């Protein structure tokens, strides 16, 4: 058992989120953050530091003054206020991860008035005779059911979890606080319940909590369900039915009492937060759930100690009920003990070694061997697989194959010779599988006589299953029966679906409802954590090897009915490329890895072209390698490789029998790199946000140099790869297929820049696009880069956004642009600290270099003076600029005048972005006069947040009507109102070329929807419309939906947040999409871009 550690990458992850914000967005974030800090006492910090902070220092500031989870929650709330849905979704996922980590690490909670201080801790005292009688009762109950060493010290030496458990109720040395609630949490089947029961036995033996507790009682959460009324005294009495003393005496000293509640994931914890419904009297009769919640919330017997067991999946719901708990994570057997139990000596050691060596990779098997019973199962399966040819074919070497080996051998008739199951025996097997499936779906793991009888498991059938060590009497007072381990129940539940392929067996729980058409619907089904492992077993069972063994056991063919449903699930997972790393995709890969069926896996992954995976464990690398190799049409891969833990299995493998070998973490990574570098169709590899060591980067780069590597685009945005970058530069020289490289957010030292530029100047380097945004570059770095521009025959695009290179650095770049061999076409210098003085050098470069077609200066304080200088070049008919981005450049009316004058002479400028400049209506009118000229070349114009009003809309309407080329106009965040929109609509009704119109947050209401609706039915070309953040209301939306559905409407992309409208309106929008399936209605309008997307505006 170990206490979880807060992930050290929280600060860096938050910094990465901030770096995704534009300059204006970042300032808005900081303003909202200061508002939040002034209202919240939980996260306060010096507000004056916020204004000066960049992304890195702001992330550090938040973590310095707030817990990691609170820093993420604060940021998530602000991202949602800013309508940044993608960032808020990612931040919410990160918040949950760090919240769970804090809970796990919090083994010493803050002192409250719940428990006594160190001075108040009850000291050792002699137990009375009645307590000793109870200890005898506990030892009689549990010692015959637990295979436990005689003394606690012996057990603790084999089970590391026991060490932390022995001191779970000790006071905190730093603050003196003694917890009265301890939570044991971990994955299912790891041995939490067994550990809790052993605790009772060791206490009874006097080895544990000596003198601290007079009584320790074990309650099962499933016994606290239902509406039946009882009292806490009655519950205790049932645990000691022949008590020689009244229960009142037992409960009279609650500070000497420990209550163990096992399996809290089975208890319904969505309890209304009304303390008035709870009770403090242990003699009062109430429904059992009320008693449970009263106990957990310390209303009932507040002085008693609680030890709770819960699966990780149920931990988040539980924490709201508890008062200052201590959380301890149960990890099961140590790796060394697992190895000893699995591969220890004995007469069959050679068989196990042979069977293990035949397997492809057994890390997942080792990971599941967390308790002795599973180790024994796997060990027996390895021995059986070591002597093939005895009746049943070997069902493979995966976890499913090993379980199938064990189960099929135990179920096979023990008659002389070998035969298949008889009809009666097949019926008993089906009944057992139905019982298991019923339990998995209903979270039921102990079955009474009625449950067994319903499924025909009585008498000889039940006796046979007990003899086979499959279904055993429950270890707690012998009530009911349970599978020998939870994983065995999950295996039989999966087998239930496979046996549907046997004629006449089609009833039971549907694996996936037939109406399921989306992954979102499926996620609601997969809430039960047991379904995850059941699903993996099911994929393993439909593999050819296991099916062959099963058909031999049954003596009849099994139709592959489950296979089609599994394919349907995989197809849903791959339906749409995710906006973030989806756990569903990685889980699908684990399932397919379990199948180990090449034909089936290739068919399942046939439609996958883009994947995004978060890889945290060595096994994640293995399953990803296996599946990515079989994604035949894969073109884009994003991998988040973060915090991969130390490979404990590989380290412990030195004690394995000679001749066996397990792959190290480095070897797993090398395999994955080999798959990526040799995939025939993969063109883009994105490792954004990953943390790669120098050795990991070296391995990757060596593989990327292979002749078979077809990757063209490498992305390391926000990745921690700087120590290994020197290996990347040589790769750029050797692999001429790599033409695009993005190192945004990677801190580059001067020596890194020098080495990179040497490679870029090499004649063999074919790099065409290089992004070095926010890399900490200096003017000296620009001098190195300028030499590349002057000599490279391939580099066409360079982005240096967010580097404070200043005027001096840009001067070096401009000098290089004037050199004849320079091939650069796209230059992005956003937020580089440029001033008006720089514009003279830029203008000079534009005059001499007609090959530069894209220029972005967004976020630089150019002002009117800078525009005056820049436009001297832009106005020339020889100027080759086609796309110019000047967002947030402090342009006003005067700047518009210079720009309008330049547009009169320029014949090539087709894209112009002026967002976040205070142009106001007079400046807009100046531009409109030029844009109405037939010779004006502008096609795309962005005017987001330019302080425009309805006064300029008449001019804009005339532009829409008269401009022969204008196709895109974005007016978001301008206060146009219904009047202004109505004026624009007059232009839309006329013959025009506009295909894209942005009206987000323009003050449109339901009153203006009638005019817009009429325009939509007339416009022949308008295909994309953004209406986000407008108060349209149900009435306005009803009017617009009529226009959306109109046959003459050509709309294909509509920006709307459907969830903000009532059900009636959402049904209308669904009707639109049913009538016109090609129409996309989404709040991600800016991602639904044409051609080269919004990148030119950066």
Swiss-Prot record:
ATP binds at residues 186-193. SUPFAM superfamilies: DEATH domain, P-loop containing nucleoside triphosphate hydrolases, RNI-like. Residues 104-131 are annotated as: Disordered. Disulfide bonds: none annotated. GO terms for cellular component: cell cortex; cortical granule; cytoplasm; cytoplasmic lattice; cytosol; germinal vesicle; Golgi apparatus; mitochondrion. Transmembrane segments: none annotated. Phosphorylated by PRKCE. Residues 122-131 have a biased composition (Basic and acidic residues). Residues 1-97 form the Pyrin domain. CDD domains: LRR_RI (cd00116), Pyrin_NALPs (cd08320). GO terms for biological process: actin filament organization; cortical granule exocytosis; establishment of organelle localization; establishment of spindle localization; exocytosis; positive regulation of embryonic development; protein storage; regulation of cell division. Oocyte-specific. LRR repeats lie at residues 851-871, 880-900, 908-928, 937-958, 965-985, 993-1013, 1021-1041. InterPro entries: DAPIN (IPR004020), DEATH-like_dom_sf (IPR011029), Leu-rich_rpt (IPR001611), LRR_dom_sf (IPR032675), NACHT_NTPase (IPR007111), NLRP_HD2 (IPR041267), NLRP_innate_immun_reg (IPR050637), NOD1/2_WH (IPR041075). Keywords: ATP-binding, Cytoplasm, Cytoplasmic vesicle, Golgi apparatus, Leucine-rich repeat, Mitochondrion, Nucleotide-binding, Nucleus, Repeat. It is found in: Cytoplasm; Cytoplasmic vesicle, Secretory vesicle, Cortical granule; Mitochondrion; Nucleus, Nucleolus. Residues 180-503 form the NACHT domain. GO terms for molecular function: ATP binding; structural constituent of cytoplasmic lattice. Belongs to the NLRP family. Component of the subcortical maternal complex (SCMC), at least composed of NLRP5, KHDC3, OOEP, and TLE6. Within the complex, interacts with OOEP, KHDC3 and TLE6. The SCMC may facilitate translocation of its components between the nuclear and cytoplasmic compartments. As part of the SCMC interacts with the SCMC-associated protein ZBED3. As part of the SCMC interacts with the SCMC-associated protein CFL1/Cofilin-1. Interacts with PRKCE. Interacts with TUBB3 at cytoskeleton microtubules. Component of the subcortical maternal complex (SCMC), a multiprotein complex that plays a key role in early embryonic development. The SCMC complex is a structural constituent of cytoplasmic lattices, which consist in fibrous structures found in the cytoplasm of oocytes and preimplantation embryos. They are required to store maternal proteins critical for embryonic development, such as proteins that control epigenetic reprogramming of the preimplantation embryo, and prevent their degradation or activation. This is NACHT, LRR and PYD domains-containing protein 5. It comes from Bos taurus (Bovine).
């Amino acid at each position: 058992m170990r206490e979880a550690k807060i992930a050290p990458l929280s600060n860096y992850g938050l910094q990465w989120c901030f770096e995704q914000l534009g300059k204006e967005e970042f300032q808005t974030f900081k303003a909202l953050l200061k508002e939040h800090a002034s209202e919240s006492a939980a996260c306060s910090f010096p507000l004056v530091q916020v204004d000066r902070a960049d992304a890195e220092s702001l992330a550090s500031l938040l973590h310095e003054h707030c817990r990691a989870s609170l820093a993420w929650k604060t940021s998530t709330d602000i991202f949602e206020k800013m309508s940044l849905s993608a960032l808020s979704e990612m931040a919410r996922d990160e918040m949950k991860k760090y919240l769970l980590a804090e809970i796990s690490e919090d083994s010493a909670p803050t002192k409250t008035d719940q428990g006594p201080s160190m001075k108040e801790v009850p000291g050792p005292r002699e137990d009375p005779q009645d307590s000793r009688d109870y200890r005898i009762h506990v030892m009689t109950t549990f010692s015959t059911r637990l295979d436990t060493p005689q003394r606690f010290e012996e057990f603790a030496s084999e089970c590391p979890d026991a060490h932390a458990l022995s001191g779970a109720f000790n006071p905190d040395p730093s603050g003196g606080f003694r917890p009265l609630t301890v939570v044991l949490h971990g994955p299912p089947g790891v041995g939490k319940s067994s550990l809790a029961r052993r605790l009772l036995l060791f206490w009874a033996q006097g080895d544990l909590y000596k003198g601290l507790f007079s009584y320790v009682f074990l309650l099962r959460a499933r016994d606290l369900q239902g509406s039946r009324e009882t009292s806490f005294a009655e519950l205790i009495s049932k645990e000691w039915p022949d008590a020689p003393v009244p229960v009142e005496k037992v409960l009279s000293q609650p500070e000497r009492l420990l209550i163990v509640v096992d399996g809290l994931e089975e208890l319904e914890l969505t309890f209304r937060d009304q303390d008035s419904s709870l009770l403090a009297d242990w003699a009062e009769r109430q429904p059992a759930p009320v008693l449970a919640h009263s106990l957990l919330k310390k209303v009932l017997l507040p002085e008693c100690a609680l030890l709770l067991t819960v699966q990780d999946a149920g931990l988040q719901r539980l924490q709201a009920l508890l008062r200052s708990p201590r959380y301890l994570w149960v990890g099961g057997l140590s790796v060394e003990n697992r190895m000893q139990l699995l591969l220890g000596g004995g007469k069959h050691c050679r068989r196990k070694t042979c069977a293990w060596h035949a397997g492809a990779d057994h890390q997942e098997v080792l990971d599941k061997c967390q308790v002795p019973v599973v180790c024994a199962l796997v060990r027996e399966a390895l021995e059986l697989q070591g002597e093939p040819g005895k009746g049943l074919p070997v069902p493979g070497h995966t976890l499913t194959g090993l379980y199938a080996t064990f189960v099929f051998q135990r179920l096979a008739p023990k008659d002389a010779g070998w035969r298949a199951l008889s009809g009666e025996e097949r019926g008993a097997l089906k009944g057992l599988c139905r019982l298991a499936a019923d339990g998995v779906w209903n979270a039921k793991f102990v079955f009474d006589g009625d449950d067994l009888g319903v499924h025909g498991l009585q008498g000889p059938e039940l006796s046979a299953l007990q003899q086979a060590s499959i279904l055993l009497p429950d270890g707690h007072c012998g009530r009911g029966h349970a599978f020998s381990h939870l994983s065995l129940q999950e295996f039989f539940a999966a087998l239930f679906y496979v046996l549907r392929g046997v004629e006449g067996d089609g009833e039971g729980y549907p694996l996936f409802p037939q109406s399921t058409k989306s992954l979102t619907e499926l996620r609601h089904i997969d809430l039960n954590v047991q379904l995850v492992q059941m699903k993996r077993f099911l994929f393993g069972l439909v593999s050819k090897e296991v099916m062959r063994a099963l058909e031999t056991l049954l003596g009849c063919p099994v139709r592959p009915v489950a296979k089609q449903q599994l394919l349907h699930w995989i197809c849903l997972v791959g339906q749409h490329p995710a906006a973030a790393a989806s756990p569903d995709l990685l889980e699908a890969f684990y399932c397919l890895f379990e199948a180990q069926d090449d034909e089936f896996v290739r068919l399942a992954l046939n439609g996958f072209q883009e994947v995004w995976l978060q890889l945290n464990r060595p096994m994640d690398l293995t399953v990803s390698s296996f599946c990515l190799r079989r994604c035949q049409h894969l073109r884009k891969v994003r991998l988040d490789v973060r915090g991969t833990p130390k490979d404990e299995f590989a380290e412990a493998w030195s004690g394995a029998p000679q001749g066996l070998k397990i792959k190290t973490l480095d070897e797993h990574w090398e395999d994955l790199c080999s798959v990526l570098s040799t995939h025939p169709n993969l063109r883009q590899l994105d490792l954004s946000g990953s943390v790669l060591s120098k050795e990991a980067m070296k391995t990757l780069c060596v593989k990327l140099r292979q002749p078979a590597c077809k990757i063209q685009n490498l992305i390391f945005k926000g990745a921690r790869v700087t120590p290994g970058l020197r290996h990347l530069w040589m790769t750029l020289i050797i692999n001429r297929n790599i033409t695009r490289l993005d190192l945004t957010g990677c801190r580059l030292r001067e020596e890194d820049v020098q080495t990179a530029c040497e490679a870029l100047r090499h004649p063999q380097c074919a790099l065409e696009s290089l992004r070095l945004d926010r890399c900490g570059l200096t003017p000296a770095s620009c001098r190195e880069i300028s030499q590349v521009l002057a000599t490279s025959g391939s580099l066409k695009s360079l982005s240096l956004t967010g580097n404070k290179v200043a005027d001096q650095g840009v001067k070096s770049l401009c000098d290089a642009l004037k050199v004849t061999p320079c091939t650069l076409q796209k230059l992005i210098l956003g937020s580089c600290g440029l001033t008006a003085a720089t514009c003279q050098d830029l203008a000079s470069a534009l005059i001499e270099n007609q090959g530069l077609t894209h220029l972005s200066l967004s976020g630089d304080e150019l002002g009117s003076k800078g525009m005056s200088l820049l436009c001297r070049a832009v106005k020339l008919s020889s100027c080759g600029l086609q796309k110019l981005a000047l967002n947030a450049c402090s342009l006003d009316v005067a700047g518009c005048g210079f720009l309008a004058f330049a547009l009169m002479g320029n014949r090539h400028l087709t894209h112009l972005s002026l967002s976040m400049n205070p142009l106001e209506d007079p400046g807009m009118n100046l531009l409109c006069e030029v844009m109405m000229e037939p010779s004006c070349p502008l096609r795309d114009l962005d005017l987001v947040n330019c302080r425009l009003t309805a006064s300029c809309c008449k001019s804009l309407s005339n532009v829409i009507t008269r401009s022969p080329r204008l196709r895109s106009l974005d007016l978001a965040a301008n206060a146009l109102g219904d009047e202004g929109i109505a004026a624009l609509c007059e232009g839309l009704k006329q013959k025009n070329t506009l295909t894209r119109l942005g009206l987000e947050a323009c003050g449109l209401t339901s009153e203006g929807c009638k005019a817009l609706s009429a325009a939509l039915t007339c416009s022949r070309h308008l295909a994309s419309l953004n209406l986000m953040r407008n108060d349209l209301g149900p009435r306005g939306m009803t009017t617009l939906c009529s226009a959306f559905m109109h046959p003459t409407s050509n709309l294909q992309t509509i920006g709307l947040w459907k969830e903000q409208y009532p059900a009636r309106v959402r049904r209308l929008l669904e009707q639109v999409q049913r009538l016109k399936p090609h129409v996309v209605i989404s709040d991600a309008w800016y991602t639904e871009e044409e051609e080269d997307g919004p990148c030119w505006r950066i």
